């Protein structure tokens, strides 16, 4: 990991993550990681909004940009804004030698390899993983991550490729997702709900469905359902919930019950052996068990596969969705 990112870790007062699209949602997960493991205040901002709101930026702050291409114009402008205020800058990028990598004080490469499809998938996984690694190392330097916790998290990370691979293999060999696509491909609206670490997974899952299948989908914090979205729930608007067994599991069960009470259909991303939730919902998108902090990385995969199968069933171009570009280089 670039030493420039870790230097001065004890003196850091604030981290601002700037990004666009899927990278922004990865940043929301990074906020949870960084605040939990480093106890540094973290803000996540759309890069396209950051420079226009006269942000409060100081030399004791770190501007952390996330951009797959390293060429996203709004993200580069946000980096420049941070530098103009004397803040240190760092970037999580995939393309080696890209503009973001060149202009920032420090860089962490995703090392995800070329991502051919316009809709980001493995770059999201790599970004979230890098954010967790940064949080672990910053936490070590600040004394907020113990040796035991570091070993626990690093050991859990070592299991991640196998778990993700098995998840994808099971999806490819079975017909669960094709059947779901057959069931739902004519629906026009979806609601995605998650809490805590899984709220960003919900909005990312909704974005994937929008991007490649052209179906309107909204991602919401589950606790906000009663503040508006609940008015939309009926037989014509399925709800996708991200509900692994974590600290907010009981809250998610309550939200599922509220959707069902209004004749809503529920698809749940949950642990495959969770018989209790299986009895509450209409369809399961199973995920494996893992460390709580790694669950978002695994939970997003069923949503990616679901969006893919929906797009295929609807005859959409998965790799080149209409009106989208891999790298947005103009405002």
Q: What are these model-derived regions, one by one?
A:
Residues 21-25, 121-128, 196, 200, ...:
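Short, conserved micro-motifs enriched in small and acidic residues
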Residues 265, 280, 290-331:
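Generic C-terminus detector
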Residues 1-16, 106-238, 311-331:
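Active-site phosphate/pyrophosphate-binding segments
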Residues 214, 286-289:
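A signal for specific C-terminal beta-sheet/loop modules enriched in small/flexible residues
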Residues 186, 222-225, 236, 261, ...:
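A charged alpha-helical hairpin associated with nucleic-acid processing machineries
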Residues 26-28, 43-44, 73-76, 176-179, ...:
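Extended hydrophobic-aromatic, low-complexity segments
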Residues 10-159, 242-285, 306:
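Glycine-rich phosphate-binding loops that contact phosphosugars or nucleotide phosphates
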């Amino acid at each position: 990991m670039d030493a420039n990112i870790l230097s001065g870790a004890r003196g850091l007062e604030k981290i601002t993550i700037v990004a666009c699209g899927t990278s922004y949602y990865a940043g929301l997960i990074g906020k949870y990681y960084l605040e939990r493991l480093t106890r540094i205040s973290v803000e996540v901002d759309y890069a396209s909004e950051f420079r226009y709101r006269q942000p409060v930026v100081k030399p004791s702050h770190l501007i952390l940009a996330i951009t797959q291409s390293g060429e996203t114009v709004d993200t580069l402008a946000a980096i420049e804004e941070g530098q103009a205020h004397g803040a240190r800058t760092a970037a999580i990028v995939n393309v080696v030698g890209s503009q973001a990598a060149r202009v920032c004080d420090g860089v962490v490469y995703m090392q995800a390899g070329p991502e051919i499809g316009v809709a980001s998938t493995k770059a999201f996984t790599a970004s979230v993983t890098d954010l967790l690694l940064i949080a672990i190392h910053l936490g070590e330097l600040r004394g907020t991550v113990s040796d035991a916790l570091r070993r626990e998290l690093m050991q859990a990370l070592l299991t991640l490729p196998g778990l993700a691979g098995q998840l994808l293999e099971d999806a490819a060999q079975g017909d669960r997702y094709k059947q779901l696509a057959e069931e739902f491909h004519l629906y026009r609206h979806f609601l995605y709900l998650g809490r805590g670490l899984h709220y960003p997974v919900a909005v990312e899952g909704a974005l994937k469905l929008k991007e490649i299948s052209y179906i309107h989908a909204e991602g919401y914090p589950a606790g906000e359902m009663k503040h508006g979205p609940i008015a939309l729930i009926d037989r014509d608007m399925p709800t996708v919930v991200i509900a692994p067994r974590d600290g907010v599991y009981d809250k998610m069960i309550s939200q599922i019950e509220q959707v069902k009470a209004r004749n809503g259909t529920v698809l749940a991303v949950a642990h495959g052996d969770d018989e209790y939730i299986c009895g509450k919902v209409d369809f399961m998108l199973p995920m494996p068990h893992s460390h709580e902090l790694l669950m978002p990385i695994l939970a997003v995969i069923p949503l990616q596969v679901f969006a893919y199968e929906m797009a295929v069933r609807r005859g959409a171009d998965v790799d080149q969705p209409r009106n989208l570009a891999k790298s947005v280089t103009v405002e």
